[in-house]
């Protein structure tokens, strides 16, 4: 993702805010 925005589309590839 571009920014650490959990409100945006979650990309479970290289993000931490993504749980599943």
Swiss-Prot record:
Domain of life, per lineage: Eukaryota
GO CC, one annotated term: extracellular region
One Gene Ontology term of the molecular function aspect: L-phenylalaine oxidase activity
UniProt keywords, alphabetically: Antibiotic, Antimicrobial, Apoptosis, Cytolysis, Disulfide bond, FAD, Flavoprotein, Glycoprotein, Hemolysis, Hemostasis impairing toxin, Oxidoreductase, Secreted, Toxin
Name by which UniProt lists this protein: L-amino-acid oxidase L2
Localization in the cell: Secreted
Post-translational modification: N-glycosylated.
Biological process per Gene Ontology, one example term: defense response to bacterium
Cofactor: FAD
Keyword Disulfide bond set for record: yes
Record-annotated membrane-spanning stretches: none
Function summary: Catalyzes an oxidative deamination of predominantly hydrophobic and aromatic L-amino acids, thus producing hydrogen peroxide that may contribute to the diverse toxic effects of this enzyme. Is active on L-Ile, L-Leu, L-Met, L-Phe, L-Trp, and L-Tyr. Exhibits diverse biological activities, such as hemorrhage, hemolysis, edema, apoptosis of vascular endothelial cells or tumor cell lines, antibacterial and antiparasitic activities, as well as regulation of platelet aggregation. Its effect on platelets is controversial, since it either induces aggregation or inhibits agonist-induced aggregation.
Description of how the protein assembles with itself and partners: Monomer. This is in contrast with most of its orthologs, that are non-covalently linked homodimers.
EC number: 1.4.3.2
Similarity annotation: Belongs to the flavin monoamine oxidase family. FIG1 subfamily.
Expression tissues: Expressed by the venom gland.
Reactions that this protein is recorded to catalyse: an L-alpha-amino acid + O2 + H2O = a 2-oxocarboxylate + H2O2 + NH4(+); L-leucine + O2 + H2O = 4-methyl-2-oxopentanoate + H2O2 + NH4(+); L-phenylalanine + O2 + H2O = 3-phenylpyruvate + H2O2 + NH4(+); L-tryptophan + O2 + H2O = indole-3-pyruvate + H2O2 + NH4(+)
């Amino acid at each position: 993702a571009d920014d650490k925005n959990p409100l945006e589309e979650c990309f479970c590839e290289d993000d931490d805010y993504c749980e599943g």
